[in-house]
């Protein structure tokens, strides 16, 4: 039995995302970004990886990169509420209130099933 089976992980990309989550939780966002980029290389349509990448980029004060990561997640899944919400929060931090409100409202609609 290999490590992926032992951890009940479906793919190497999922394993890499879990590693990234652990690094992000300890504040090592640069390492998390590296894991996430590897996960995306393995599975280019992994919306959760793009969203977590955006979160880490935000923590590293790379706001434009974070927005681009959320946009990639949303191109894959336009109904991914977490990406809409996180994008809205960054836009709000950047003073882009109108765009932020639109994104956050979209996320609320999706969370509520509207």
Say what each PLM segment does.
Residues 10-42:
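Alpha-helical segment of the N-proximal tetratricopeptide repeat
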Residues 40-41, 71-75, 108-109:
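Conserved structural position within tetratricopeptide repeats
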């Amino acid at each position: 039995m290999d490590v992926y089976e032992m951890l009940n992980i479906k793919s190497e990309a999922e394993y890499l995302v879990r590693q990234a989550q652990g690094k992000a939780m300890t504040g090592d966002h640069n390492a998390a970004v590296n894991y996430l980029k590897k996960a995306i290389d393995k599975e280019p349509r992994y919306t959760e990886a793009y969203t977590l990448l955006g979160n880490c980029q935000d923590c590293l004060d790379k706001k434009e990169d974070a927005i681009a990561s959320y946009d990639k997640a949303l191109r894959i899944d336009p109904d991914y509420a977490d990406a809409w919400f996180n994008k809205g929060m960054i836009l709000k931090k950047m003073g882009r209130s109108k765009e932020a409100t639109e994104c956050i409202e979209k996320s609320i609609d999706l969370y509520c099933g509207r």
